[in-house]
Amino acid sequence: MKRNLLYWLCRQLICVASDTVFRGEVVGVHNVPRTGPLLIASNHCSHLDPPLLGCQIPHQIRFFARKTLWKPGIPNWWMNHIECIPVDRDGADVGALKKTIAALEAGGVVILFPEGTRSMDGQLQPAKSGVGMIACKTGVPVVPARIFGSFEAFGRNAKIPTPHPVSYVLGRPLRPADYDDPASGKQRYQLASERIMAAIAALELPARPLL
């Protein structure tokens, strides 16, 4: 994938802010393959999740963003130049699905959230079928990721972010044999999403030694 200088500049600025305001632990970066295509599947508690998780991944990331953010002028220019994928959250968005699959087929790296939306209480929510569909259709490796602390830093009902440690655990890549069961019929994509979500739920921060 061609290097996007604007993306990397923005990433660097966000990383500085993250290290200053939300510094936490990062575990398992070695599990992220050096090259794409690749799906990063994470829990979702906060608007902070996409940019902060993106700072932990040594790749140029494609993110979903709701279509309403594409406003005339600078917002439209900005969203296009950092190569976000517009998605209509009011219904099934075939266009977003096609763009995501195309990005992966081109060797890209995409972050998706199996829960589909931010958690109301910071707890893990049931997975929806979308991530499973994309994973099964492309057969790409899926790296499960779990974010800790972003709900406390900027939960769904918060007005402004609060300084709080945000930590990340990245698991080993799941291969198609780990999540896809073509014989499962109509439940294939939902089952794949649930297997991916189970891998996310299994991730924990290492226990700290007792003093």
Regions from the PLM with identified roles:
Residues 1-20:
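Extreme N-terminal tail/first-helix region
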Residues 2-5, 95-211:
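Non-catalytic C-terminal accessory region of glycerolipid acyltransferases
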Residues 6, 19-20, 32-91:
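Catalytic core of membrane glycerolipid acyltransferases/transacylases, capturing the structured
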Residues 13-15, 81-87, 114-118:
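Short, basic, glycine/proline-bearing loop/turn elements
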Residues 17-19, 78-79, 103, 135:
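A generic structural signal for well-ordered alpha-helical segments
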Residues 19-27, 151-152:
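Short gly/ser/thr-rich secondary-structure transition/capping motifs
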Residues 21-25, 91-97:
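Glycine-rich, highly charged phosphate/nucleotide-binding loops
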Residues 30-33, 101-102:
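Short amphipathic alpha-helix with an adjacent loop that forms part of the alpha/beta core around
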